């Protein structure tokens, strides 16, 4: 009985030692890399694919892309040397629904866990314009955001811009 107990103890001790030695592996997982932010994905020069106007009262839509020179719309979302949002400019002869220049930032720089859309905030020094981001660039270089106009807190019209990143 002693021999069996002694042998089992020795096997258990040997197994525990082997596990402790192999468990102390120093595999290099690489250096820390910061996660990709929405600002990184959204920054750059964007040209219009389409602009849709939606009447929020009755959900009617109208394509404005070929009307009122919306096909000339370009927005440049610039970053500073550190990769942070900095300035923006709007070019083209489309109606000025957005400020033409100023600074930009995201309300939250990552995908929100509660699935609410992120907002792109444009500030021209006088007022801040909030754009609801409805599509973020990924495999396809497409950015989509919506500008919603309200009266007395109720939305009455929105403009959805579908943009493609310009070739650098």
Could you tell me what each predicted segment is?
Residues 1-11:
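Bacterial N-terminal signal peptides that target proteins for export
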Residues 13-16:
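Core hydrophobic alpha-helical transmembrane segments of single-pass membrane proteins
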Residues 19-23:
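C-terminal motif of bacterial Sec signal peptides marking the signal peptidase cleavage site
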Residues 25-99, 109-168:
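Lipid interaction determinants
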Residues 102-104:
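Short beta-strand-centered aromatic/proline hotspots
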């Amino acid at each position: 009985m002693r021999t069996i107990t002694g042998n089992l103890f020795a096997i258990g001790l040997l197994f525990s030692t082997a596990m402790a030695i192999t468990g102390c592996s120093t595999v290099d997982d690489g250096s820390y890399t910061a996660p990709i932010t929405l600002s990184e994905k959204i920054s750059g020069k964007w040209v219009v694919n389409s602009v849709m106007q939606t009447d929020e009262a009755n959900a009617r839509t109208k394509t404005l892309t070929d009307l009122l020179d919306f096909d000339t719309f370009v927005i440049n979302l610039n970053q500073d040397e550190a990769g942070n949002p900095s300035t923006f400019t709007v070019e083209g002869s489309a109606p000025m629904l957005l400020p033409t220049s100023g600074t930009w930032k995201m309300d939250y720089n990552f995908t929100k866990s509660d699935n609410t859309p992120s907002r792109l905030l444009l500030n021209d020094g006088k007022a801040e314009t909030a754009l609801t981001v409805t599509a973020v660039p990924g495999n396809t270089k497409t950015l989509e955001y919506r500008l919603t106009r309200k009266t007395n807190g109720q939305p009455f019209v929105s403009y959805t811009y579908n943009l493609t990143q310009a070739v650098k």
